[in-house]
Amino acid sequence: MDKINNENDKINISIKAPIGNIEDNNNNSNNNSNNNSVSNSNNNSSISINSGSNTPTNSKNRGIKIFDLDDPFTSKRLSGFFSPESLAELSKLQLNDTDNNDNLTTTTTTTTTTTTTTTTTNTITSKNNSPNTSPLLSSTTISSITSGAPIKKRFERIPSGLSHVTNHYDDDDDDESSSSEEDFDSTELVCRPNKTSSTTATTTTTTTSVSPLTSSFVMRRPSSPSPPPSCSSPTLSPSLSATRRLSGNLVKVATDSDNQSLEPCNNKTIVDNNDNDNDNNNNHNNNNNNNNNNNSTEDISIKPICNKTFLDLDEKIYLKIFGYLFAEDLCSINRVSKHLCNIINNQQLWKDLFSIYIKIYSEPSDIYIWDEDLYSIYNNNNNNNNNNNNNNNNNNNNNNSNISNNNNNINNSNGNNNPYFTGGVSNSSIGAIGGSIGSSAGSNIALKLRSNTSIPIIERGRSNTIAMPTPTFINEINMLNSNNSVNNNNNISNNNTINSNNAGVIINPSGTVNNNINNINSSNSINSSSSSGSNINLSNNNSSTIHGSYISSNLILNSVLRKFTPTTSVPSTNEVTDFIESCHHFPSKLLICKLVQRYLVPREFQRHLSDIDWVKMVERPIQLRVGKLLKKVIDQKKVNFDYGTMLILRSFIRGYIQSTSDMAKGLIVGLQKKQVLKVFDISRVSDILLIKIFRNLDSIKDLSVCQRVSKRWNKAIAISSLWEQLYLNYRKKLHHEGDINIWDDPSLHTVEYLYEFFDQIQPSPQQQQQQQQQQQQQQQQQQQPQLQTNESNNNNEDIKQNDNNNNNSNNNGLNNLQKLIEENLEGSNLSNGGNSGSSFSPFNPLSGSNGGSSFGPFGSGGGGGSNSNIGGSSNQLNSSSGGGGSGFLAMASGGSSVSSVTSTPSTISTNCTPTGGSTTNSPNFQSPMVSSSTVLPPPIPFSPNLSSPRSMSISLSSPPPLPNKPPELKLPDSSLSPNSSFNNNLSSTSISIPSTPTTTPSSSLLTFIPPNTTSTTTTTSTTNITSTTMPISAATTTTTTTTSTTSTIIQPIQPIPPVNNNGSQSDLSKISDLNANPNTTTTTTTNTIESSSSSSSITNNNENIIEPIKSPQPSMINVQKLMNLNQLVDKLTSITVATEISEVNACLATYRTFISTSQLVEKLFQRYHIPRASNIKSILDWKQRIETPIQVKVCKVFKKLIDDHFDDFNGTIIELFKVFLLHIIDKQSPLTNHLIRSFSRKLSGENGSTGSVIGITGGKSSRKGGGSGSGSGSGGGSGSSIIGGAVGGTIKASQSKIGRMMSVRKAQQFNDIISLPAEEIAKQLTLIEFEIFGKIQSSEFLNQSWAKEKTFHLAPNIRASIDRFNTVTKWVCTIILKEEKIRTRTKIMSKLLKVAKNLRSYSNFHTLMAILSGLNEIHIYRLKFTQQELKPKIQKISSELQTLMSVEGNHEAYRTELSNVDPKQSCIPYLGVYLKDLTFIQDDTNKKGDGINIKQSLNLYNILKTIQNFQKNPYSFEEFPKIKETLLNLPVWTEDNLYRVSMQREPRNCKRSDLI
């Protein structure tokens, strides 16, 4: 009976005999069996026991990370740690899965000897820091093993992403991600008993299998991505290959890290990772050939993806996806279609896979084969004093029944921190290895290479030797350290004690090697039934022997392959044959890796050769010889390849060898004979694997294409929140360090304050119901006196109304008016009001009510907002008169007598008072919102300290005494329609005339009260006023208004925009974006108000004079000179402050002067995502009040930014907007469709709209003094030679084809243009100039990018315009100085002045200034005799033009001329003036402090807007290509040539008679 005290998490022992009785004893050994204690200091080790040989394998402990850091599938950015919740769930699962026997870990191993059965009992004690021990098998599992029932363990996914094992005894239900047709599955584990031998093995993380032919264990890599429940603590990291082969239907073929091939043999037990029993196991167990009747439970609900869907994928996406798959996956996809086959044949894809596999399967102590050739070799002195004892490794003492093993002293190199460490090996160890691989070939190779095996090599830092977890070694390595003993006794019980100590070999720079020899004591007890034997001490160190053997093999292979693959000489055929015959004794993975390393020749080797010679003399010879060796190794029948070796070989062949070459074909044929890899369909990839793949796709295009492949892929992308992750990744790229979130800025209002404020100004639903009831009662009370009045009016139709008589004022006209008011009260003219007369609409900024007595933000009083013209007259009657309804934007002015009493900030009382009876006051009702846009909270000053909420209480005082009636206003007869039915009686009716146009409702009666206001004045009147209306003149800004309504006159704290309610109430911007009309004034009864743009005065006969209401100036309205970025974005998207559209446009047009585009976009996205307040009452209420209005504001800014500044977007911003508009933005928002449409339009026209800058540049100016020379003309003006002169001379003209010296051209071309009419020349010059001017972007004028050489690329069009200006200037000088005769020069100057005159008539001031600058150049200005020859008419033209473009008075004459140009007329302004103004505005010396200056932005915007207006009006001249081409290639001379020729034409102190 074997008992194992297992404190390790990764110990597996396979079982080869039927299990007997199992006892549940902890740390108690059976007295009938001997105890073998194995002490292992490594926490994570895998030990396989076979015939007394113990081969522990050290693996790297990587903590409790979920994903493997070295797994290319789950990259480092996806790796994380277990959360406490995950650990709690894992512990709970362990408790449920384990019975009372918590520490039962019993396995039984039986071994067959020659005479009797020998029982080897191994008690393995592993040092582990964890105090808890967990069983390898639960009670239910053990009972199932003993009973022979099959157990299927299925991994179930828990919310934390871990996997746990649950036992199922039925095979009917299968997970959708599993497939029964595959042999190995990583998501399900099945432990089956062998039906022939009734043996069962259990697997936790590492599975083993026994091969009788080799008497060794087959170690496989773990297949579970996370530790099973049997682990006490999740300290195990998943295997690399297992994590990558996570799919439920992935075929896993012998995932052992060493050379184990599954060969058919008798009495063989294989514990593999199958999900179901199926007939495919026959490849691994030929004794089970009769098990073909096993049913497959493949899930047929998942159908393979059609080939056509894959054809829709892009090649780049293919390569990205395939880069995360293994070779078997690619081989399966390779057979899908020719298109995929061509893509998979991409060698770069396989090269990447090859590098991944090398990293995974390479040993950390691997020695690079080219190190000895590339780096200097240090001599070392091997001081081994135990060589004499090492030659007796295989000698057995058979006579005395004593085993004497003298193990080799191997120097292990574990000093990873020492740059000079290496793995040394003694001569005796070479002899031991030679003996183990055979006396014929192995010994000869060892003897020949003995002198080269102990050469120390510097540790290399190449990528293919990155330290990875050490995989288990193959059987041959175990055999090197096993003791071949012959047992003559009947019963032998071996007791092996292993001390795992690693000896490091440190090589000093001087080359001295210090060998630390380990003394390991092992005792073997031989007990006989008749007598007891003696104990013999053995020197054994398995760990050192394993590493030493590996390093020895490494060194031997390096030397052998260097000898067999030289560059010039030919290796011996006999030696090569001996090596091939014995190569199966080397680890197969190590052998293949060395051959591949040798094939990839580094360029540093023989670097003195040229590339061609190096390929011919070095690379190709070595590669051909390596290819031949590789083919022979593959064809060697004794060499068995494991899974990792096959991956390395296949990826290497596909990546580095041409598929059509004979070498590639031969290697592929050899691999097909060796072993066939089974593959799975890509459509069956599990959802977890799909999500892991998709998370590595960092492009919206890749995810979008994958989303359209199949419904399953679409679902995987949808449920994994990949779009949100991609959205956040893009935003992280725009984020700047040190940036404060806009919602965390203490200088701004918090969301809680905003919500509380809107909660105060909006009544609760109960109050709104009361308001509805009060409104209905009011309507009923209004109808009763109106009926009585109608009866009395029938008897008094012919009586004129007296001034003080209030009983005889009704007539037919008034009756019609009252009927119309009643219809408005009943809501008969409204769409949503119905016949009930009242319609409630909650405060929804996006859906205002239009019906009845509307309550809502867009309800316009009792009439719902419809305007009516009565009797064909021009007098407008507002629908809210007499209605009593109110809304957030309701209009309360009307034509009939209305008494209004304000009791609370949100209470408005209205009443219709008939003229024929006494005054009747209607009951008060409460309005849901104060009917004015000034109800919005005032802006707080942008200071670090947040101000407290402002009070909105309104107190009323007693009304003043009634004033006398003012003088009667008479209306001209022409103002009334002759067809009106009540024109004669209209004088008894008081009708208000709105001060705004008839298409715009009048302003509201209430405005916001300042915080410091404690009382207001309210006047009430019940008298009847007889007045007439006055016509509204379009040319007069002053209006006169008489009303009979009771109004509240309040001094506003700021102007609030009026409501431009044109019937469309879905746009939230009407709440705060539209400006109020300062000319509209509400007055008390019997008062005459004269409203103007500056002030309004209120007078009456009783000399009750109220102070004039002054309209505040725009410059004094809430102007914050300096603010930070958060305050600016808050101002642009505020729902509490009315933001002027000019400020928004100015900030968006000039934002690049203080921030970048990425910063602005990121701030707007921060503003869009509003953190939810903690004091909200309901989600719907929160969205309606705060979230939706702010998001709509942000979307408006986004739309403006996309429409006007899309060229400023980089690739990241464009991708971010794509994700935002497709997957993040609220699709129910009213501006979503507009925003998507604008973005799509810009995106589709991006390539076509960005035209290249026209290749028109000027010659390089060599003028001293910065190129700002000027000369005074005959008219007293002066012209700048280049535009840069206006800016300070910092601009340098660039050299181009126009600026070349035209000496190679024919002389006739100089006269071709001059011979044309001046008018035609001016037209063609204007067309060329406007083509450049129209391409200038607004962003080019910012930050003086045109004047700094480092930022020329930011203003290419301005630079093109400057170069063109300089070219024209030099061309004028060239064509004048070219002529030798004075008369000819005079004609050319006269022609140029005529051209300039025509340019002025075409408003082409830019080219005009260029010609005048050429005439004022020193080379031309000094030709006084030439200028004297000009005619007086031409001299007058020159004087006028020089005066126009003079710089005197800051270009006053030119500015005046430009201001008189018709805005619709085509014009090209002189850019020099604008550049000088922009330079002054953007000068940093004028900056008073840190922050954003809105005033400066407004000034910049005004200039940019002017330029944009000029760009909108192109010229309509006919274009002549030949003339245009000639004008584009103007001939110019250099400065030196111009000066030299000028001195030749008119030398100094010459006379006229001396000249021609």
Curated annotation (Swiss-Prot):
Any one annotated GO CC term: plasma membrane
Q: Which CDD domains does the entry mention?
A: RasGEF, REM
Which organism does this record belong to? Dictyostelium discoideum (Social amoeba)
- Note whether Nucleus occurs among the keywords: no
A Pfam family assignment: F-box-like
| Composition bias, Polar residues | 256-271, 911-935, 1059-1076
Residue intervals of the Ras-GEF domain = 1317-1548
Biased region (Low complexity) positions are 25-54, 96-141, 196-216, 279-295, 827-848, 867-880, 888-910, 943-957, 972-1053, 1077-1101
Q: What is this protein called?
A: Ras guanine nucleotide exchange factor G
**Function as written in the Swiss-Prot or TrEMBL entry:** Promotes the exchange of Ras-bound GDP by GTP.
Extent of Acidic residues compositional bias: 170-186
GO MF term list: guanyl-nucleotide exchange factor activity
Q: List, for all copies, the residue spans of the domain called N-terminal Ras-GEF.
A: 1116-1244
Matching entries from InterPro entries are given as: F-box-like_dom_sf, F-box_dom, Ras-like_GEF, Ras-like_Gua-exchang_fac_N, Ras_GEF_dom_sf, RASGEF_cat_dom, RASGEF_cat_dom_sf
Positions of the F-box domain: 307-353, 679-726
Region span, Disordered: 19-63, 93-141, 163-239, 254-296, 385-416, 762-815, 827-1101, 1254-1279
- Gene Ontology BP term (one): Ras protein signal transduction
Biased amino acid composition, Gly residues? 849-866, 1264-1279
